[in-house]
UniProtKB/Swiss-Prot annotation:
It catalyses: [protein]-dithiol + NAD(+) = [protein]-disulfide + NADH + H(+); [protein]-dithiol + NADP(+) = [protein]-disulfide + NADPH + H(+). The keyword Endoplasmic reticulum does not apply. It holds the Pfam family Thioredoxin_7. This is Thiol:disulfide interchange protein DsbD 1. The lineage of its organism: Bacteria, Pseudomonadati, Pseudomonadota, Gammaproteobacteria, Pseudomonadales. It comes from the Bacteria.
Amino acid sequence: MRRLLTLILLLVALPAGAGLFDSRPGASLGGGLDGGGFLKVDQAFKPSVERSDAQHVLLRFVNAEGYYLYRHRFQFKVEPAQVSLGQVQLPAGKQHHDEYFGDTEVYYNIVDLEIPLNNPARQPYTLVVTYQGCADKGLCYPPETRRFDIDGGAATPAASDAAGKGPLEHKGKRSLLFFFLAGLTLTFTPCVLPMLPILSGVVLRGRPGGGRGFVLSLAYVLPMALCFALLGALMGMFGASLNLQAQLQSPWVLVPFAAFFALFAVAMFGFFELRLPGFIREPLDRLAGDARGGSILGAATLGVLSSLLVSPCVSAPLAASLLYISASGDAWGGGLQLFALGLGMGTPLVVFGAGGGALLPKSGAWMNGVRNAFGVLLLAVAVWLLERVVSGPVALMLWGMLAGGAGLALGALEFTPKSAARRLLQLLGLMFLTYAVAAWIGALQGESDPIHPLGRSVPSIHAGPPSTPGEWQNLTTPAQLDAALAEARQAGKPVLLDWYADWCISCKVIERQVLTDPTVQARLPAYRLLRFDITESNPAQRGLLDRYNLFGPPAILFFAPGGDEWSDLRVIGEIDAAGLAERLRRAATRQ
């Protein structure tokens, strides 16, 4: 039963890990969110000129977590005419498949763009950059244009103000929580958990429990976590010095990283052990044996030494974490993440010190399941890294192989008498194996989405703005919108205003999957239906976005018969049919 609970925990952790092992800056602690939880465009995408001379300009974009830029939407020009641009060679991006727009390339995290130019006189000039991006949660920003004034090869300070506001703005609470949970889970491995009573015997002198035990355990755990934090900060600085995060787009970095994660996974499966060299480990063992227990100083000393004596069960995921942090290039963030990891690893010891061994689970064979679960998770990270290098169908094939291997390991095809717990594990294995078969079939058919391996049946779209004939009125100028709103106000009819653009993926989803839903369709006739097309994204249309405090499409606004907006009902980003139907129902009660 404990193995089953461990595997269920793995299933919960996998999607979290898929989102949290992105080497891209987060923004969940930063400001600038609108009512829908989206960042302003200048906070979602932060461009800066890092270096410039007479022949080149290095332009860097720092994208917040969950936001990406389209490779094909970049445009560059320089002013005045005496300075000219060369042929810009954009780096390869991550393959991004959309049901409507097909295969594109996008940039996550940090991307460096090398822009060649001809400026032999080194005269001042202005670099004009146009770009466009979206949020994973379903918001597309209009094309944005930034101007950088460069004085004879050096960017002015105003042009470089997008370099980031501090570590906390780029590290979300989720990553810290994930590292804490990872550390907590690492404790329940075959090598670490049995050591807890031994360690507590040295630190607590065999007297766990009470306030004294809590203080001594805390004195042991905090220095251990601080050592992990120092290690994480150093790895972050090392990664920053090599600019690994920007280089992470390159197959020459991604493939070795994926190989390292796969190697660590094999170590977690018990095929070999990763340990410190003997000439380092043995002196540390002697120091730990000489440390005095029963005192705060002795507990702190043991905590520091314990952080250096990495056991075989912890070294593989710890090394994987260090690789990840070195790629992030964030010293502060790396320190915080490994501090959280250390706190997670030390939490069971604090629990033991405060309440005694009765509060901790007993060691046993179930802990091998934790170790194997970490191996599967590390393999999943390796596949995730390879997704940036290989084609979509190949990546889907790899996900299928991982799921199939996990299913077979759980005994999916072992039809022999089993206990109830093992039958549940076999059922879980059959689910993994079923997904694996679906992934392989989808890959052979050219699919690439691991969430929908067999693809989704979607209707074709027309080139122009979508509309339901005879119902939706399409608008493109502020004057047209004002006139339509005034007409609806005079008629005493509520208005449903849909913001749309051809380049907005989520707009297509809403048009084809939400507005066509029968529960939504049944309530639409009560409204004057307006659709504002912001595809052109001219200054007048962008001014209209500012007027309504919007960042871009999709968005749906509700207006009362008297012309006032029901702001609590507005939709920003994607929404499903049930959510929109509920808003329509609430609006109907106000008429």
